Each structure stands twice: as C-alpha cells, then as structure tokens.
UniProtKB/Swiss-Prot annotation:
Subunit structure: Component of the PI3K (PI3KC3/PI3K-III/class III phosphatidylinositol 3-kinase) complex the core of which is composed of the catalytic subunit PIK3C3, the regulatory subunit PIK3R4 and BECN1 associating with additional regulatory/auxiliary subunits to form alternative complex forms. Alternative complex forms containing a fourth regulatory subunit in a mutually exclusive manner are PI3K complex I (PI3KC3-C1) containing ATG14, and PI3K complex II (PI3KC3-C2) containing UVRAG.
Extent of the WD repeats: 991-1030, 1040-1079, 1093-1134, 1139-1178, 1182-1223, 1237-1278, 1327-1358
Region called Disordered, residue ranges: 875-899, 1307-1326
UniProt modified residues of type Phosphoserine: S808, S813, S853, S865
GO biological process, alphabetically ordered: cellular response to glucose starvation; late endosome to vacuole transport; macroautophagy; protein targeting to vacuole
First-listed, main subcellular location of the protein, grouped into a coarse class: other
EC number: 2.7.11.1
Gene name, Swiss-Prot/TrEMBL: PIK3R4
Taxonomy of the source species: Eukaryota, Metazoa, Chordata, Craniata, Vertebrata
Function summary: Regulatory subunit of the PI3K complex that mediates formation of phosphatidylinositol 3-phosphate; different complex forms are believed to play a role in multiple membrane trafficking pathways: PI3KC3-C1 is involved in initiation of autophagosomes and PI3KC3-C2 in maturation of autophagosomes and endocytosis. Involved in regulation of degradative endocytic trafficking and cytokinesis, probably in the context of PI3KC3-C2.
CDD domains: STKc_Vps15 (cd13980)
Localization per Swiss-Prot or TrEMBL: Late endosome; Cytoplasmic vesicle, Autophagosome; Membrane
Protein's name according to its UniProt entry: Phosphoinositide 3-kinase regulatory subunit 4
Recorded family membership: Belongs to the protein kinase superfamily. Ser/Thr protein kinase family.
Required co-factors: Mn(2+)
Length: 1358
C-alpha cells in the first residue's frame, strides 16, 4: 500500500517541447515544470504569454471529450468572474498524443509572492484574502467548484489582483486515506507534501477495493480516470472553503502551511489540531475566520458570501467593499491593457481616491494609521505600470501621483516600493522625466522620519550612486534639477545617518536587547560614515559648481547653499563652497550669476563666521561698483544683512559707509533705498558718538538738513537731496573719456569753491562737446557736485562695462541665442502698422538727421537713405524751388500707406548737403524712363509693404467674420408668430425607393432636398407644395454619388448642396433652379473620397461661413471631425475624437462658430473649442443611451438639445455645468428613469426661437409628429400620428432639479362623445406607417412641415 503507481508507465517519455510541433498558433518558450500528471510549459501567442498544460495520453480509451466539454462549460460560467482565470482553451493536439489546456500566463502565484520582496504587509494580506473569498464566491454562484485550491493555484498579479486558476473539476473528488499515491499523483505537484484537501475527501480505502477488481495488480492506480467512480462523489462548496482557509492561514503566517498529508489525516480523525500555526496569526479576526473555514465538520463551514458579510468591518475593512473592489476591478478588464491608460485614469480619479481611502483619517490619529488606509493597494497598481510606460506625459503623471500619495504612505512603502522606481526613472531617455524623477525622489526621501534596520545604508550604497550620473547629464534641465535638490538630498542623508546612530545608541543602552551584536558591527564608526558621505556629496557639489552653464551654478546657490554649509561644516563650507562661489564674480557677462552670489553670501558668511569678512570685503566692494544696477542692489542688501548679524569688523563698516554714502544721490530708486537701509543699520550698531563723529560726515553732502534719528529709514529718506538726473548720469557714464570729464568737473568745482582763480575750457574737443551736451540736458552745479561724489563708483562701473564689451568680442556669444544690439551699435527701426498723428516736419527732420549718421551701408542697402523729407535731395533742374524752402517735396501715398518722396526727372542729380550740419552720406537717385515716377524703394521696404497689405487683408477678413457672427440669425425665415400646425396633409411624395435619411431646406426656403439609401438626392420646389400646381414631383434628381446617401446640407446663403455617401464620397453640388423657360440643372463642383479604413463614412455634416473661409464640417464614423475649406479645397482644421467615448452619431455647431458639440453612441456629449481646436468638456447621459440627434438651443448659448435612445426623450443640457436642465418625456415610463419599457426614440428634431417663445418639433419611431411649446408646455400637442392616437395631455414637474414635461395619455371614454373636436374627417390615417427619420419646416406664404420615413415616403403638412 502506498507504493502503487498512479498511472500506467509510458513506453516513451517525451519532452514538453515536442508536443508543440503540431500547434501553429503557439510557440514554445520554456518549461515550467513537469509532474507525472501534467507537463507544464510557457508559450508565446500573438496576444501574450500563455501557460500550456500537457496531459500525455497513455490510454486511448480515456473519455477526454467529456472532460473537454466540462471545461468549456466551466469557461462560459466563469465568463463574468473577474477573480477567476479558467482554462481558455482545451484541445487534443499533437496527433492525439496529448490533451492540452491553455490559459493566460501570470508570473507569480501566492506561494512565490509570500517570499518575494517587497514583502506583503498587513493590509495587502487582508486584500488578498478578501479577493480569495471573492473569487470562491464568484465561482460558487454559477455552480462551479474548484477542487484544488492551494497557494500554487492562486495567482497574484504585479498589482496584487488575485486570480483563482487551474480549476480541477476533472480530478477525483475522493481519495483513499490509506494510500498516498493518488494524492501525490493529482494534488502534490509541488512535492512539498502540503495538503489543502478537505478531510471529508479522504475515505476508507476499502470503498475503492470493493469497486475495483484490479487490486491484484499492484501497478494499477486506485483511482481510475476511465471509470465512473469519480462522478460518484460530487465536489461540495465546503470542500473549497476548507482549502481557501488553508491558503489564507499560510498567507498570514508568512508561508507556514497548516497541514501536511499526515497531519490532515490525523486532523480528520481528531488526533491533531494546527493550534501552533494558528497562533502565529496575530489578528484575532483573521484567526477566527480561518478556524471557522477549516472546521472538521463540513456543515459547520459557511458559504464564501457569508464569510464576506461576517467579516465586513472586522477582518476586511469597509473600504474593500465600497470602493477598492469595484474600482480595482476596472483594471482587470481587457479594455485597460495599456499602462499609460491606467496611470491617466488614476490621475483623473485621484481626488476621489484620496477622499475614499483617506477621508476617515483624523489629525489626532497616530502616525501608524496611514499604513493601514489602503493606499498601498493603489500604489501597487501605479508601480506595476511604471516600467512599461511608453509616453513621457504618462511618466510625468505617474511621478505626480507618487508625489501626491507619498505623504500618506508609510516609511517602508516609500523606501522599498517607491524609491526603486524613481531611480529607474532617473535613467529615462527623456530629460524632463529624469529631472522630475530626481525632484520627486528628493521630496519622497525627505518624508522619511525613521530608518528601518534593513535600510540603514540606503543613501551611500543605493541612492547617491544611483543618481550620481545626473550631475554630468547632457541635458541642462537635469543638472538644474540636481543643483536644485542636492542640498535637501544631503540634509536627508545626514538625518538618515543620525537616526541610525541614535537607534544604535539606544540599543546599546538597552540591556534587554538581544540584537546589539547584530547592529553595532555593520553600522561601523559614525565619523567614518559621515566622512564617506561628505566625500560623495562634495564630489557632486564641486561638479555642479564647475558646470559650464551658469544657470546650474545660480540654481545651486539659490536653493539651499546655507544647508550645504551646515552639512559640510565650517571648514569645508569655507574650503569647498566659498572658494568656488568667489569665482562666479569673474563672469562679467552674466549679472544674474553675480546677483545670485550676493543673494547667497549672507548665509555662507553667517555660517563661516566673522573670520570671512576679510575675504569677503573686496568681493562686496566689487559688487558695489558692478556694471549692473541690480547687482549693486543685491550687494547693498547683503552688506546690510551682514552688518545686522555683526559679521563686519568696525573699520570695514566705516569703509563701506564711505563707499555707500554717494549712493544716496544715485538715480536708481532701489539703490538709494538700499543705501538708506545700510546707513540706518550701521547707525543702530554703533554708538551715538560714532554716529555723529564718523557716520554723519559721510552723509552731510547728501541731506538737506541735519537729523537726529538716523536709524529710522523714513526720517533719512525725507531729508535726502534730489538724485542725479538719470539722463545726465547715463550720458556721463557712457562717455569714452570719463577720466578727463571728471578732471574738468573737479576743476570747475575748485573754481566755484575759490581754490582756483579760473577754469580754462577743455582742450579736447570731445570733452568740450560732452560738457556742452551735459549742460544742454540741464546739468547744474549741484548736479556736478553729485557726479563728483559718485566719481569713484562711476569710473569703476565705466571700466566694468568696458570689460564686458571686451569679453564679448573674445567669445562667440556671451549668451546663447542673445544678440545685444546696443553693444553692436545698431539702431533699431520700427514702422507702426496703425497710422498715428504725424509730428511736425522740423522735429522729424532733426530726428532723422541724428540717426542717419550711425547707419551703416548694409542697412542703407536694405532700407535706403534715412534722409528726412526736408533734406535737399538730388533735385532735377527746373523743379519747384519751394521744395527747398519749405522742406515739403512732392509726396505720394504708396499702396501700403507709406509716404515716400518722388523724383520728377530722369537726370542725374547733384549731391548736396544741409547747411550748418556735419556732412551726411550722399545718396544718388536712380535714372528712370521719361513720363514715369521713380519710387526710392528697396527690398525691405517692398517686404514691409507686402506685410502691411497682408495685415490689412487679415484685419478685413476678421472684421467681416465678426460682423457675420454678430449678425448671425438662427434662421432666415422663422415660422410666423403664433404658428400652430393643424396636421393637414398637403403632399404625399413616394419617389424614393428606400429609406430617406435626411431633409434639408435652403436658406431662403425656395428649395428643400432629401437623400436616401437608394443612392439618390431629390430637390423639390417649396412653392409647389402650396397646392397651387398639379404636380409636386421633384424638380431635380442626382444619383451619381454611389452608395447610400446618409446626410446632406445646404451651404449658407447659396444653392450649393453638400452630400455624403456611405462609400466615403463627399460631393459639393451646384443647383441652378432657374425660372421658366430654363430647366433646372444640378452639377458636381468639388468632391473628395475618404479613406474607409482610417476615417470611415460621414455620419453628419454642417456648413458655416466664417468670412475668410467657407467651411463644410463633417464627422466620420471613426472619430474624425474635419472642417473642409471649400474655397481652398484644403482642410481648415481637423479634430480627433476619442472612440472610447463611443462612435459619433451627430454633432451641432454654435451659431457664432465658437464651439461645437458631438454626440456619441455611448451617450457622451463632448464640446470642442473651434478657435483653438481643443476639447473643452465632456458629459455623459446617466443611462449612457445613444445620442440620436443634436441641436443647439436657440436662446441659451451653452445649451444643447439632445434626442436620446428610448422613452422619446429629448433633453436640454447646459454644457458649461453638465446639468440636464429641461426634458421632454413622451413615454409611459416614470420620467428620467433609466429603465426603458418604451423603445421609441426621437429621430428628427427642429427648433425655432419664435420671437422668444421657442418651439420644438419632434418625430421618431412611434411615427408621431409632436409640437412642443417650450414656453407654455401645457399647450403642446400631437400634430399627426400613424393611427387614430388617443388624446394626450402635457404636465410640467421638477424631478431632481430638472424641469420635465411629460406626455400622459388621457383615459378613453366608453361611448362616442360629440363634444370631442376632430382634427379632420373620419378617413384612413394619413400619418406615416414607418419610423420617421427626419423633420424640417419651410415658409412660403404660410408655414409647412416636411417629414420623411424609413419606407421612402416624404410628407408635407400644414
């Protein structure tokens, strides 16, 4: 006993790969293990990886067909079970050598997942246990029993979704208790001897002996698959419950099984109970659940559904039932195959997710609470997608999600599950993703407040090496992110090290701790660890401080340079940081970098200490004489702060005070305020005696009167003298020989003071000219004194500016992409496209003369001479001399609106110059033919004229379009006031041979057109419908488009008709409906054929005129929205609708052409902004019913009217808010109910504003035409019906904030009533006998309704 073989020994043992020779759809990948029962392999299929289980057929008489049918039935029953993964296919292949089972491949089963990092935490264990019970419940409800639930058959995806697989209904239900051969053969495939089989499935071996007569042969298996004995015992639900309980117990004991075979048999007999294993389950609710599930008596075990109800709020949190299970189930559907789609869906739902998962967390709860809030389950979904994301926007969205969720997650989740993926993103191919990953990593690590034992070396061994390459990244944006975050990274790394050290010290001081030997050794010496950390960070900081891009250095200084000082300590802050920062002042071309230095130096100096003042003094002085005034302001602020902190020695303070005092008269307001701030701080720092003895002498020249409270800013500001004029200051500062200028100004000052008897005029004519210019700009003696006070600053600044110009010539470009026109001596030119009032000619002449002297020859070759009109041009002999005297030569207005002088003679002129002016460059005018004019014009002027003409045309087109939109009318001929059609049939037209799809009326209502599935378009004369003529036949028929014509529309303000067929053809037809004796004609003008695979056929179309464009807008079945410009035969715009929202069924365009709205087969109404071609909003019908027809509301600009499938519902939606405002309900069903006992729908709608009281005509599948009075709904009525319809009434009510007008049938009276008015004589019904497909109106001498139906009939009513 126990040694018998569980199967017939095969004559030939084949490898699992050999069975794939006859299978063409599957390619062998690798073996997943083999047992005597099954050989298991992984194979490749076009839809992904699959698991193939091969059963080698040794006995041809086995009834495999019945097993196959059973598996097929099981697959059908489990079709809707989202936590079950049955075999998708069962086949007998390989020349009947084997039977094969196929199912989707999932990488991990629960047995593997329990022992795989990152280990499952408590909330994940609960979630998996919850799903196991849910899967069992999903299987049991349709009558399926598993038969072999074990950890190897519970698959767990990368996002912790449980799939119960390998349903084993074909395995024996009962096993002999005294022979393990059958158990080993069928159930112990892992060879672990672990047993999950319910004890009642083991029976006395004698039962088998009485039925089997083959016991004499010891090689015969006790259980024969070919006999009927396996069907004797039916699998019970309680058996699966026991197995599931064993799996849940193993899950919560971290892989310790409840039973092996011998223990289970002992448990069956009451000789064993797994109390020791159950006590390892810490949670009381789970332990109680498992104990009930593994009860020895099957009757004492409950159903899976009962356990789920029992443990709701106990073992399983309420959020599993209310949110997580339904939300996570959507990702298990086939529609969510893309990782990018999952991330975008989660980002969209993030607010709702956090509200559901974290809304119960209160501020007073402990810090441990977030670990149990279920967010980790969502994190597993996010992290499972990260490595397979394709698009960079999805990757950025994923990083954004991590950043939002990180503050609500525990430490181990952040370190074990989030950090590795962030380091993965730091190697992404897109620079923006690398940069954002680094920022996110820094912020996530900063949230870690404690360090687990296994992560004590995470920074030096994992994080810093993982991002080290980013400091030398090719993309500046990545290095910028590194510089921005390295201070926080260093600070967090130091905190990690200190937390570890503190934890070790606490453990050493704890005498009861048994882990001292394990902890103190690996950590090593704190100083050694700190030094290694300093070296790693220092290497990257030095790399960033030496970066070729200044913006990287600037970012490093602006983002935590002081924190880096604290990290490195005083010595390294001085040796590493300060020494590199000083070099930034050598860059004379980037004042932003110099300014950032002074912004950052205060924090560094404060940490290094007052010893640095001697080093910083020349740097600060250099900042006070910088060429850029913004840098001076920042230097003043830095000095003020350092003085406040006591970082400046007193001699240095007075020295700086003498340098800064002249700034009190600087023309820059910020500099003056900065100087005042420094002076007031110094006054507070020194004694009163020093204020008046040492500080006041510096201030006296710049204040109007003596003051006492120098330390108050407002007081000092109120007594300051007027600053130097900005124009005088700038002119003097820009002069080339500023030293000689100040020498002469000093001599003039000495003369005023009486030190010199006389001051001779300057010998240098340039200085004389400069002085004359300054005096002409209003320089007074006080201004001269202030300039002399600023002498040292101005000379240094002048020299600094000269150095900048010199350096700019040494380099190709001081800044990439920047051209300094001022440095190159180029004067800008501009032409106003809008005419302004002309200046007097004499002023304009002076301005042009001044500018022309600086214009080079290349500029002249482009624009011609800049000689003003009053300059003597090359005048021909005999020309009017008044031109010279008045300065007004003959002028002509060019087509572009530019005034240009004209020459009137072909002779070569003389070259002349202006009197009392420096000679200007002469310009010769060209020789031209007699009796013509020569316009002195060059290439740039020609292009300028073309630009102006183009702008004028564009402006004119926009003005026309605006006028058209402002004057847009809903319809050219609205129904007459008080129009209420009586339902009298005027014309019955049966020319079409198949369903009529659409009716359209021309703008002036003289024609209306119909299109049909018979491939024809028929044009009819509206005038003939009044009954004054004998015939009402169509005047034109067009049938050359091919296919079934699905839609058509008239072009605004014309007799052009656009039609579209289901064969992809779109044609524009011209209609000549002339009066007699000429016969009407129709001919095609333009056409295009759409790609049926890419676009599909057109489902709806509209036309509108936008002034510059005549746009035919059409929507296709594959989601394309195209605006075809009929004037240029090209597309004005193209929009792409996402087919996830359903196929487009109809669309409508705003009357002002600002937006359009599309309706889909899934009930979605999506709006697009037509100006920017961007989606605006999207709203969905509550029942997701198909949108059959859309129309804009005539009064409310943001409303659309939508006819939807079922209940004859027509609703008016506010697309701005997504609210359903008004509903017409012609159905016996309760209003706004999502149930649809009435299948009838509205197929055609017509709406008119009707002088502020809008009316609506609807018609559809119930073959009735209804007139809806939207202002007075009670006045609505049925215009015409298919038969003698019962009378109806209309009532208004408010339901859930929506105003509903419901049609209710009146009760029929028993006998005939003479009081009931009749709409017409008692005759055959004149209404339609098939679905009405469309409705329209036209006006001649009275109003008419025209309807069409699916049987090809067109009827006209009045």
């Amino acid at each position: 006993m126990g040694n018998q073989l569980a199967g017939i020994a095969p004559s030939q043992i084949l490898s699992v790969e050999s069975y794939f020779s006859d299978i063409h759809d599957f390619e062998y990948d690798k073996s997943l293990g083999s047992t005597r029962f099954f050989k298991v392999a992984r194979a490749k299929h076009r839809e992904g990886l699959v698991v193939v289980k091969v059963f080698a057929i040794q006995d041809p008489t086995l009834p495999l067909t019945s097993y196959k049918q059973e598996l097929e039935e099981l697959k059908i029953r489990l079709n809707s079970a989202q936590n079950c993964l049955p075999f998708q296919k069962a086949s007998e292949k390989a020349s009947e050598k084997a039977a094969m089972l196929f199912r989707q491949y999932v990488r991990d089963n629960l047995y593997d997942r329990i022992s795989t990092r990152p280990f499952l935490n408590n909330i994940e264990n609960r979630w998996i246990a919850f799903q196991i019970l849910t899967a069992v419940d999903q299987a049991h409800k349709p009558g399926v029993r598993h038969g072999d639930i074990k950890t190897e058959n519970v698959m767990v995806t990368s996002w912790n979704w449980v799939l119960l697989t390998d349903f084993a209904s074909f395995k024996p239900t009962y096993l002999p208790e005294d022979n393990p051969a059958d158990f080993n053969y069928f159930f112990d495939t892992s060879r672990r001897r672990t047993c999950y089989i319910a004890p009642e499935r083991f029976v006395d071996g004698g039962m088998f002996a009485t039925e089997l007569e083959y016991m004499r042969d010891p090689s015969t298996p006790l259980v024969d698959l070919n006999s009927n004995q396996r069907t004797r015992g039916e699998l019970k639900r309680a058996m699966d419950i026991f197995s599931a309980g064993c799996v849940i117990a193993e899950l919560f004991t971290e892989g310790v099984p409840l039973f092996d075979l011998s223990q289970l048999l002992a448990y069956r007999n009451g000789h064993f109970f797994p109390e020791q294993v159950l006590n390892k389950i810490e949670d009381h609710s789970i332990r109680e659940l498992v104990t009930q599930m593994i009860h020895r008596e099957p009757d004492k075990r409950l159903e899976a559904e009962d356990y789920l109800k029992q443990q709701r709020g106990n073992a399983f949190p309420e959020i599993f039932y209310t949110f997580l299970q339904p939300y996570m189930a959507q990702f298990a559907k086939e529609t969510f195959l893309s990782a990018d789609e999952r991330i975008l869906v989660i980002r969209k739902d993030l607010g709702n997710i956090i509200h559901n998962l974290c809304g119960h967390d209160l501020p007073e709860k402990t810090e441990e609470e977030p670990k149990e809030n279920g967010l980790v389950i969502l994190v597993s979904v996010i992290t499972s997608c990260l490595q397979t994301l394709k698009y960079y926007d999805s990757k950025l969205a994923a990083l954004e999600l991590i950043l939002h969720l990180a503050p609500r997650l525990g430490v181990e989740i952040l370190l074990d599950r989030i950090t590795p993926y962030l380091l993965h993103f730091s190697n992404d191919s897109v620079p923006r993703v690398r940069a954002e990953a680094l920022r996110t990593l820094t912020k996530v690590l900063a949230l870690v407040k404690e360090v687990p034992r296994n992560d004590i070396n995470i920074y030096p061994e994992y994080i810093l090496p993982g991002i080290a390459h980013l400091a030398q990244d090719d993309a500046t944006i990545v290095r910028l992110a590194y510089a921005e975050n390295i201070a926080l990274l260093a600070e967090t790394a130091l905190r990690f090290l200190e937390l570890v050290q503190l934890k070790n010290l606490n453990m050493e001081n704890d005498p009861n701790n048994e882990e001292i030997d394990e902890v103190t050794h690996p950590n090593g010496n704190y100083d050694t660890e700190l030094q290694a950390l300093h070296e790693m960070v220092q290497q990257k900081v030095v790399t960033l401080l030496s970066d070729p891009e200044n913006i990287v250095k600037q970012t490093l200084m602006e983002n935590g340079i002081t924190r880096l000082c604290v990290f490195f300590g005083r010595q390294k802050a001085n040796d590493v940081l300060l020494s590199h920062m000083i070099t930034f002042l050598n860059d004379k071309n980037d004042w932003h970098l110099r300014g950032a230095f002074f912004d950052s130096i205060v924090g560094v100096a404060a940490y290094v200490g007052w010893q640095s003042s001697s080093i910083l003094k020349p740097l600060l002085q250099q900042g006070l004489s910088d060429a850029e005034e913004f840098v001076i302001v920042k230097a003043l602020y830095a000095l003020t702060c350092m003085c406040q902190l006591g970082l400046l020695q007193k001699p240095h303070v007075y020295e700086f005070a003498s340098d800064i005092a002249p700034f009190l008269c600087h023309p820059n307001l910020w500099i003056r305020y900065g100087a005042v701030g420094f002076v007031t701080v110094v006054a507070r720092q020194i004694s009163t005696a020093d204020v008046y003895c040492k500080l006041m002498p510096y201030l006296d020249p710049y204040i109007t009167q003596p003051i006492i409270q120098i330390e108050r800013k407002l007081v000092l500001l109120s007594v300051l003298k007027e600053p130097v004029s900005r124009s005088i200051f700038d002119y003097a500062l820009r002069s080339k020989d500023i030293t000689s200028l100040f020498r002469h100004l000093h001599m003039r000052q000495k003369k005023r003071n009486g030190s010199l008897p006389d001051c001779p005029p300057p010998e240098d004519p340039a200085i004389a000219q400069l002085l004359k210019k300054l005096l002409s700009q209003g320089m007074t003696e006080d201004e001269e004194d202030k300039l002399l006070a600023l002498k040292d600053f101005m000379m240094k600044s002048n020299k600094a500016k000269a150095n900048i110009v010199d350096q700019s010539h040494l380099h190709d470009s001081s800044q990439k992409g920047v051209i300094d026109l001022a440095a190159l001596g180029i004067t800008g030119r501009q032409v106003d496209l809008v005419k302004t009032k002309q200046e007097p000619d004499d002023k304009r002449a002076r301005k042009h003369v001044k500018q022309d002297s600086n214009v080079n020859e290349e500029w002249k070759s482009m624009f011609g001479s800049l000689d003003p009109p009053n300059m003597p041009q090359a005048l021909p002999k005999g020309s009017d001399q008044e031109v010279i005297q008045t300065g007004k030569p003959p002028r002509s207005e060019s087509s572009a609106g530019i005034c240009v002088p004209l020459s009137t003679s072909p002779q070569v002129p003389e070259v002349t110059t202006i009197q009392n002016k420096k000679p200007v460059i002469p310009v010769l005018s060209s020789t031209i033919l007699p009796s013509t004019y020569q316009i002195r014009i060059t290439t740039c002027k020609t292009e300028l004229q073309q630009l102006i003409q183009q702008k004028r045309e564009q402006c004119n087109a926009e003005r026309i379009a605006k006028q058209m939109m402002e004057n847009a009318e809903w319809e050219s001929k609205p129904p007459p006031p008080g129009w209420r059609p009586k339902g009298l049939l005027v014309a019955h037209l049966h020319e079409h041979k198949s369903a009529v799809n659409r009716i359209r009326v021309s703008d002036e209502h003289s024609l209306f057109a119909t299109c049909s599935n018979d491939g024809t378009v028929k044009i009819r004369n509206s005038q003939k419908m009044e009954g004054k003529t004998t015939t009402t036949r169509s005047i034109l028929t067009y049938s050359r488009v091919g296919g079934r014509v699905k839609t058509l529309t008239f072009c605004q303000g014309s007799h052009y008709l656009a039609i579209a067929s289901d064969n992809g053809a779109v044609q524009l037809l011209g209609i000549e409906a002339s009066k007699l004796p000429k016969s009407p004609k129709i001919h095609p003008l333009q056409s295009r054929i759409l790609d049926q695979k890419e676009d599909g056929c057109v489902v709806d179309m509209h036309h509108f005129n936008s002034g510059a464009q005549s746009v035919l807008a059409y929507a296709t079945v594959n989601g394309s929205l195209v605006g075809w410009d009929l004037r240029s035969s090209s597309n004005a715009w193209t929009l792409k609708h996402d087919l996830k929202s359903g196929l487009i069924t109809s669309f409508a365009v705003d009357i002002h052409q600002c937006w359009l709205c599309i309706g889909t087969s899934s009930g979605t109404m999506a709006c697009w902004d037509m100006r920017f071609q961007l989606p605006i909003s999207s709203h969905c019908h509550p029942s997701r019913a198909r949108i059959r027809r859309l129309s804009m509301h005539p009064l409310y600009q943001s409303w659309v009217i939508a006819a939807v499938q079922g209940n004859n519902e027509v609703s008016m939606w506010d697309m701005e808010t997504g609210d359903r405002r008004f509903t017409l309900w012609a159905s016996s069903a309760p209003p706004l109910s999502e149930l649809q006992p009435s299948p009838h729908s509205v197929h055609g709608i017509y709406c008119s504003p009707a002088d502020g009281n809008p009316i609506l005509l609807t018609a559809g599948s119930d073959m009735k035409i209804r007139f809806w009075d939207l202002a007075y709904p009670e006045r609505s009525y049925v215009v015409a019906g298919s038969t003698s319809s019962p009378s109806v009434s209309y009532y208004r009510k408010i339901i859930e904030g929506t105003e509903v007008v419901q049609e209710i049938q009146n009760k029929q009276k028993v006998g005939p009533s003479d009081d009931t008015p009749r709409r017409g004589p008692e005759s055959l019904p004149v209404g339609h006998h098939d679905i009405i497909t469309d409705v329209a109106t036209f006006q001649t001498t009275q109003g008419f309704i025209v309807t069409a139906s699916r049987d090809g009939i067109v009827k006209v009513w009045k």
